[in-house]
A protein has these predicted regions:
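Fe-S ferredoxin-like electron-transfer domains
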Residues: 13-158, 164, 171-172, 176-183, ...
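Flanking helices and flexible, charged tails adjoining ferredoxin-like Fe-S electron-transfer domains
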Residues: 143-233
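Beta-rich nucleic-acid/ligand-interaction surfaces
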Residues: 8-10
Length: 233
């Protein structure tokens, strides 16, 4: 759940460590460093508690990884593999909240792990306050703030910050790739791409290129090869 300076709420308890002289484990993300402190990050006690906490998170998470957009690039999946979690000792209890699949931003409540990153990034960075906690107890999850009737009638600017900072696949952009291929296959359609400046940088970063690298020519060439008729900056 940790995001430096933005989300330091110690919610997930995955970063627990053992401090010499203390009987209880503490969260590394919220415990101040002190002089002469001795910290054990991988003791048997730490490993056992960390494993249990991840198992509890997984018990409220839809683990259909093969059909998830974040498969292979998922913080929770990586944690589960690192901790050797291949079976769950707890019964599944997953909250499923309906969502408008036509909206460009798609939320899957079945995958939400209640890290609250989306809430904090939207509140503290974007200042839009779109997300909030709903329900109580074990049914607590994240949904559109009750200030808005629904996501379509909210102040969401579709900036994508909540998607970028979600550690799992609970938030994603609507996939319009099938519609694009359908248009490209139609010989009666003239297809035009207009590229926004921000896309150039984001596209390069996704390929592992440095932000200052010039990727516009590569992008134009790729789009033309895919089959678009015209590409404009």
């Amino acid at each position: 759940c940790y995001l430096e300076g933005i989300n330091e709420i110690s919610a997930c308890k995955v970063c627990v460590v053992e401090v010499q002289g203390k009987t209880k484990l503490v969260t590394a993300c919220s415990t101040p460093v002190q002089d002469d402190i001795v910290v054990f990050t991988n003791s048997p006690k730490v490993r056992a508690v960390r494993r249990t906490n991840v198992e509890l998170i997984l018990s409220q998470h839809d683990c259909l990884c093969a059909t998830c957009v974040r498969s292979g690039n998922c913080a929770l999946q990586t944690l589960a593999n690192d901790l050797g979690i291949f079976e769950l000792p707890y019964e599944k209890d997953i909250v499923d909240i309906p969502w408008d699949k036509e909206f460009p931003l798609i939320r899957d409540s079945k995958k939400c792990i209640k890290c609250m990153r989306c809430i904090q990034i939207c509140d503290k960075v974007q200042g839009l306050n779109i997300w909030d906690l709903v329900n109580t107890g074990g049914r607590t999850t994240v949904d559109v703030s009750d200030k808005f009737p629904n996501i379509a009638q909210s102040d969401c600017s579709l900036c994508g910050q909540c998607i970028t900072h979600c550690p799992v696949g609970a938030l994603k952009e609507r996939d319009d790739v099938p519609k694009i291929f359908e248009v490209l296959a139609n010989p009666d359609k003239v297809t035009v791409v207009q590229v926004a400046p921000a896309v150039r940088v984001a596209w390069g970063e996704a390929l592992g290129l440095a932000p200052e690298q010039f990727t516009e020519g590569m992008m134009v060439a790729a789009l033309k090869k895919i089959g678009f008729d015209y590409v404009f900056d």
